[in-house]
Amino acid sequence: MLEFYGKRFESRLLLGTAQYPSPSILADAVRASLSRIVTVSLRRESGEARAGQDFWALIKALGVAVLPNTAGCHTPREALTTAHMAREVFGTNWIKLEVIGDTDTLQPDPFGLVEAARILCDEGFEVFPYMNDDLIVAERLIEAGCKVLMPWGAPIGSGRGLNNPYALKTMRAHFPDIPLVVDAGIGVPSHAAAAMELGFDAVLINTAVAKAGDPAAMARAFALAVEAGRLAYEADPIEARDMASPSTPLLGKAFL
C-alpha cells in the first residue's frame, strides 16, 4: 500500500486537476482513475473567487486527499508565500513544491528547490518536491527534511515518457526506503507502467488525462497500467539479455 507521511492509500495513481474541459469531466476522470490523491493549484485571481469555491466544493465532494502545489513559482520566496496560502485555504500541511528554473523546459531550479524545502520542512510542512533526476539534489532534499521525492520523467506536459530510465532506476536503487513518484512527462499508460516496473511507488498524471479525447477512459487506462506495472515489479521480472535463451527444454525431445 502507498504511504506518504504516515497516511496510507490503496491507489498508486495521483491525478492532477488542471486543464479539464469541464468540472463534470474532471469528476468523472477522478472517479475512473480510482485515485485517492489529487493535486490542486491555488488560484490567486480575486475575480475567480466564486469559481474557486465551486472547484473546492467539487474536490471535497469526491472525498479525495488534496495535495496543493506551488505551480508557476520561480523563486523560493514565491513558493513559500504560495505554500502558506495553500495551507490556510486547503487545511493541509502537504505541499507539492515547485520552483521553476527555466520557462521553456519548466525544469525545476534545484538550488531554489532545496532552499525552499528546508524552510518549509522547518515550518511543519510535509513537502513533495518536484525535482529532476539528479541524485545529489535528491540527497540534499532528504537532508532538508523531505520524506518523498518526485523526479520528473520528462518536461511537464511533453508526453515524452521516461527520458532517462537509467537515472530513475539508479535513484530507486539509491533510495530504497524513500517513496518515489514519477512526476511530469508521462504521455500514455505504457509510460506509467514502465515507471512502476522500475520500482517507483506511484506516478502523477495530469495533461495525459485532461487533454485526452476521453479523459475518463484514459484515467481508467492509467489506473490499470499503474496496477499492472506494480504487479510486474513485485513479481520480479527477468533481466533483459543480449542473446536468445530457448524457452523449450531439449529434454525428452526426439532426435531424428
UniProtKB/Swiss-Prot annotation:
Keywords, sorted A to Z: Cytoplasm, Schiff base, Thiamine biosynthesis, Transferase
EC id: 2.8.1.10
SUPFAM superfamilies on file: ThiG-like (SSF110399)
Range of residues in the leader sequence: none
Gene3D superfamilies xref list: Aldolase class I
GO MF, one annotated term: thiazole synthase activity
Chief localization: cytoplasm
Binding-site list for 1-deoxy-D-xylulose 5-phosphate: G157, A184, G185, N206, T207
Pathway: Cofactor biosynthesis; thiamine diphosphate biosynthesis
Gene Ontology cellular-component terms listed: cytoplasm
CDD domains: ThiG
The reaction(s) this protein catalyses: [ThiS sulfur-carrier protein]-C-terminal-Gly-aminoethanethioate + 2-iminoacetate + 1-deoxy-D-xylulose 5-phosphate = [ThiS sulfur-carrier protein]-C-terminal Gly-Gly + 2-[(2R,5Z)-2-carboxy-4-methylthiazol-5(2H)-ylidene]ethyl phosphate + 2 H2O + H(+)
Subcellular locations according to the entry: Cytoplasm
Domain of life: Bacteria
UniProt key word Cell division: no
Primary enzyme class: transferase
GO biological process: thiamine diphosphate biosynthetic process
One Pfam family, short name: ThiG
Family: Belongs to the ThiG family.
Function statement: Catalyzes the rearrangement of 1-deoxy-D-xylulose 5-phosphate (DXP) to produce the thiazole phosphate moiety of thiamine. Sulfur is provided by the thiocarboxylate moiety of the carrier protein ThiS. In vitro, sulfur can be provided by H(2)S.
Subunit details: Homotetramer. Forms heterodimers with either ThiH or ThiS.
Name assigned to this protein: Thiazole synthase
Organism of provenance: Brucella ovis (strain ATCC 25840 / 63/290 / NCTC 10512)
